[in-house]
C-alpha cells in the first residue's frame, strides 16, 4: 500500500479518503481483500474515526468498500455493471464537453492541453502508468473546467471508481500504447 503525505490543511477524513481511494484505484488494495480500519489508521498516523468516516463515504458514494456489521470490511470486487454505467456516463458527457470546448477554448487552454498530451507521451515512453493515468484525468478535468463544468467533473470522478480500476489494470498490462493528438 502506498501512503502519500498529508496535504497542508487537509482534514484527517479527507486524507484517509484520498489515500484509501488512490490505493483502491491503483489496485494496491486488491478487489476482495479485507480492509482493517484499525491497522490502516495506525499506518497513516491518524485516529480511527476519520478512517471509518472515509470508509462510510466511499461505501455510500461508490460501493467500493463493503461493510459487514460486526464482521469487518473488504474492498469490493470490480462491479462490471458500474463499470459500464461509468463508461456510458463518460461517453455522453465527454462528447458534450468536447463540443463545448471547441467553442469556449482560448489559445492558453489549447496550449495547456497540448502540454498535457506531450507529458502523457513522455510518461508512456518512460513506462509510468500511474503518472499517465493522472495526466489523462487532468486533461479531462481541464476540458470540464474550461467549459465551466467542474462540479460535473467531480461528480463523474466519484462515480467512476470501478471504471478507474479497470483503466489502472489495463494501462499496467497493455504493451503497445499510443496517444493520438
Features from the language model and the residues they span:
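Short linear motifs at protein or domain termini
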Residues: 1-99, 103
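Conserved amphipathic alpha-helical segments that form helical-bundle/coiled-coil interaction surfaces
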Residues: 107-168, 180-181
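Short, surface-exposed, polar/charged, turn-prone segments marking secondary-structure boundaries
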Residues: 93-96, 102-104, 161, 172-174, ...
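Mobile beta-alpha loop/short-helix "lid" or hinge segments that flank ligand
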Residues: 60-66, 157-161, 177
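Hydrophobic faces of stable alpha-helices that mediate helix-helix packing
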Residues: 87-95, 110-114, 177-181
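C-terminal-biased regions
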Residues: 5, 57, 168-181
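A ubiquitous short alpha-helical element
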Residues: 78-84, 101-106, 123-128, 168-176
Amino acid at each position: 500500500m502506498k501512503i502519500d503525505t498529508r496535504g497542508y490543511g487537509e482534514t484527517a477524513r479527507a486524507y484517509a479518503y484520498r489515500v484509501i481511494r488512490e490505493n483502491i484505484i491503483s489496485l494496491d488494495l486488491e478487489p476482495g481483500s479485507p480492509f482493517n480500519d484499525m491497522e490502516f489508521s495506525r499506518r497513516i498516523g491518524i485516529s480511527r474515526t476519520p478512517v471509518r468516516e472515509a470508509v462510510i463515504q466511499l461505501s455510500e458514494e461508490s460501493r467500493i468498500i463493503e461493510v459487514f456489521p460486526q464482521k469487518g470490511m473488504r474492498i469490493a470486487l470490480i462491479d462490471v455493471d458500474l463499470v459500464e454505467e461509468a463508461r456510458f456516463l463518460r461517453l455522453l458527457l465527454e462528447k458534450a464537453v468536447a463540443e463545448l470546448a471547441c467553442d469556449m477554448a482560448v489559445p492558453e487552454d489549447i496550449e495547456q492541453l497540448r502540454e498535457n498530451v506531450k507529458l502523457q507521451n513522455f510518461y508512456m515512453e518512460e513506462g509510468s502508468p500511474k503518472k499517465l493515468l493522472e495526466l489523462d484525468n487532468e486533461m479531462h478535468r481541464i476540458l470540464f473546467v474550461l467549459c465551466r463544468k467542474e462540479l460535473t467533473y467531480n461528480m463523474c470522478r466519484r462515480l467512476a471508481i470501478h471504471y478507474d480500476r479497470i483503466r489502472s489494470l489495463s494501462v499496467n498490462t497493455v504493451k503497445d500504447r499510443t496517444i493520438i493528438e
